[in-house]
Amino acid sequence: MSSFNPTTKTNEAMQAALQQASSAGNPDIRPAHLLAAILEQTDGVAAPVLMATGVDPKEILAEAKKLVASYPKASGANMANPNFNRDALNAFTAAQELAGELGDEYVSTEVLLAGIARGKSDAADLLTNKGATYDAIKEAFPSVRGSQRVTTQDPEGQFQALEKYSTDLTKLAREGKIDPVIGRDQEIRRVVQVLSRRTKNNPVLIGEPGVGKTAIVEGLARRIVAGDVPESLKGKTLISLDLGSMVAGAKYRGEFEERLKAVLDEIKGANGEVVTFIDELHTIVGAGASGESAMDAGNMIKPLLARGELRLVGATTLNEYRKYIEKDAALERRFQQVYVGEPTVEDAIGILRGLKERYEVHHGVRIQDSALVAAAELSNRYITSRFLPDKAIDLVDEAASRLRMEIDSSPQEIDELERIVRRLEIEEMALSKESDAASKERLEKLRSELADEREKLSELKARWQNEKTAIDDVREMKEELEALRSESDIAERDGNYGRVAELRYGRIPELEKQIEDAESKVEVNENAMLTEEVTPDTIADVVSAWTGIPAGKMMQGETEKLLNMERVLGNRVVGQLEAVTAVSDAVRRSRAGVADPNRPTGSFLFLGPTGVGKTELAKAVAEFLFDDDRAMIRIDMSEYGEKHSVARLVGAPPGYVGYDQGGQLTEAVRRRPYTVVLFDEVEKAHPDVFDILLQVLDEGRLTDGQGRTVDFRNTILILTSNLGAGGTREQMMDAVKMAFKPEFVNRLDDVVIFDRLSPEQLTSIVDIQIKQLTDRLAGRRLNLRVSDSAKAWLAERGYDPAYGARPLRRLIQQAIGDTLAKELLAGNVRDGDGVLVDVADGGQKLDVSRAV
């Protein structure tokens, strides 16, 4: 034993054997203990070696455990630390000799297995009787460890390294587990051209996230399987290397490098038969480097890449390629760039049509072609931060998922009936305890009603179950059809043309006819409780859920609401018909789809004296659209008086404090692209601030400090100003031309001038202000009644042409609010009381008192 040099796994097996013998009460450790310990290792090499000899390792393990259980038991002080018996020591000696023959520096578990088989023990007999003889085990070594020698204490991590740390894409394609790739022929052809070169045959796919870089490699795998590639790639294996699993669990320095070296040696040993794919290629830069070492994965593969010994396909985004790969010129020159651009909307629709059947089978629903068109068009218009076709595929996937959830959930009609039945059952239990005649009569009626409702419920449940079963049957048939098509393709590749003919001209057409009949039965039922078809409206609902933008068709209620928008806004903003009409027209244009899709929904400059409703109209629009007057982005331009403050809107430039935080305007719009943006008191801002708004007003876009494009096409931009207040319309327009550059004014949809408020209009504003005060008092259940004479008194004293409606708000606060607060604190008015406001002292003041 002094010369026995075990690997880490062998050492672990010896410790496990000792533990087994000790816990079983065996006086010594025998080869059966070692055999059981070796085969119990989850990531050991002995089990794959046995499988290569045609023996089931689980069966051997079970038999070895039976042998251990049959050994004699003893008790005493030495039982805690049993020794290896002669047979076990002979096995170690045989294993050490075999390791020397193989040129191994350490004894690994599969060599110890051969040592056990060579001896004369019950464990050796067990292996030999099952067919795992010493010679058979020895011959099986190359299938697991190749031509590698054991030169480290952890060689098992290097055996079958390619199988452990990669995924065989060609195998997945052969099994039909890869989605079809539509289009991208030019990019795939370019990848094949680069792979066919003699040296530097390493294409790298670069493009924005979500444009289909990984899909191109999967498309190449499908083509290799179909034989639709040049001779230089026919029959090759395309594997996807998983650097994450290679790094995971590498505890000691150099362990990652050992694993990577084993993978590279295995690829090199395949003599060009293996093409390697690394997704997120930039991760190889720095992977495995530790401390002072510069030997990362990128540097390890450079020589192989240059010599053409490693055919590598990479995929990474533009930013990460620039950040990691381009910095290392020696690594960059070994790759050939293949740029993958974003597909057009038409191309994206083609891609969706190719994937449609896969998603129909997975979700068990049908997807209309018009829904695919809507997904491509709506995602292109409204989801600007992501790229086609990924965002369109996600829309279709989520819409189908939403529909499937509705099919699996109980319909609304059944839910409502179940609630009614539960309520009636509770009433029945309560009435059954009463003994008076009225209660008994009511109980009889209730039982009759309950029986009717239960019957209705059972009918509805039966209908729902039948419809659900019909939809599920179609889904199962589609799954079977896909499996048969995959089987047909495999049979064709294997040359089994009899089976191909049987499937393609027999079972597949028969199943297609059954699916067609089943789907037509589902369609015939017009009063169906369930819908199993994804429509453009379903897609639009998902877009609305993602972005908050109402992209779907307008319902009847919304149409009427939009047609009456002036009246709704006019109830809150009095006497400004021109402004209300301009904003209402902009919103209607947007919802009807006739607005320019490349500009904001509307951009307005509101001019007029203070207190006439400029800011109030912006709040009213926000309340109309979002049912909350605070649901808008408000930028107080008085805070942007200095030139440098423009950076606060779009975010600080690189190198400045706050660069990573984004801008106050751009971040807010990025989070809520469908909103009202109010720039209040614009004349107080520095003139340079308006230069950044030029692109927003004209193109509906703005680039923030981090280079991201923010979409303003679904916003309503409102700028308010007091410029020229008090002058005529012409004087106000002249003041605007003096204050703002012509290119800024020219980009606005409209410059709306607010008129001064008349005394008559102030009377209407009194009602609005009183209603707001009443709403604030609702929490204390106070019923506020203001007499007509008190309203007239407020309108008369609150009118000031120079200050608009704001003096009226202050007057209501002083004349009613202050007095009411004192009455509440004194206890003269309590929660739930009525409060009367009337004129007192001959019209000198208002009296606020508890209503009798």
UniProtKB/Swiss-Prot annotation:
Region annotation NBD1: where it falls in the sequence: 160-342
Record keywords, A-Z: ATP-binding, Chaperone, Coiled coil, Cytoplasm, Nucleotide-binding, Repeat, Stress response
Induction field: By heat shock.
SMART domains (alphabetical): AAA, ClpB_D2-small
Main location: cytoplasm
Pfam families for this protein: AAA, AAA_2, AAA_lid_9, Clp_N, ClpB_D2-small
Coiled coil is among the record's keywords: yes
InterPro entries linked to this entry: AAA+_ATPase, ATPase_AAA_core, Chaperonin_ClpB, Clp_ATPase_C, Clp_N_dom_sf, Clp_R_dom, ClpA/B, ClpA/B_CS1
Region (Repeat 1): 6-71
Segments for region (NBD2): 558-756
Residue ranges that the Swiss-Prot or TrEMBL entry lists as coiled coil: 393-527
Residues binding ATP 1, per UniProt: 207-214
Subunit structure, as described in the record: Homohexamer. The oligomerization is ATP-dependent.
Function: Part of a stress-induced multi-chaperone system, it is involved in the recovery of the cell from heat-induced damage, in cooperation with DnaK, DnaJ and GrpE. Acts before DnaK, in the processing of protein aggregates. Protein binding stimulates the ATPase activity; ATP hydrolysis unfolds the denatured protein aggregates, which probably helps expose new hydrophobic binding sites on the surface of ClpB-bound aggregates, contributing to the solubilization and refolding of denatured protein aggregates by DnaK. Necessary for survival of C.glutamicum at high temperatures.
Protein's recorded name: Chaperone protein ClpB
Organism of provenance: Corynebacterium glutamicum (strain ATCC 13032 / DSM 20300 / JCM 1318 / BCRC 11384 / CCUG 27702 / LMG 3730 / NBRC 12168 / NCIMB 10025 / NRRL B-2784 / 534)
Organismal lineage: Bacteria, Bacillati, Actinomycetota, Actinomycetes, Mycobacteriales
Gene name of the record: clpB
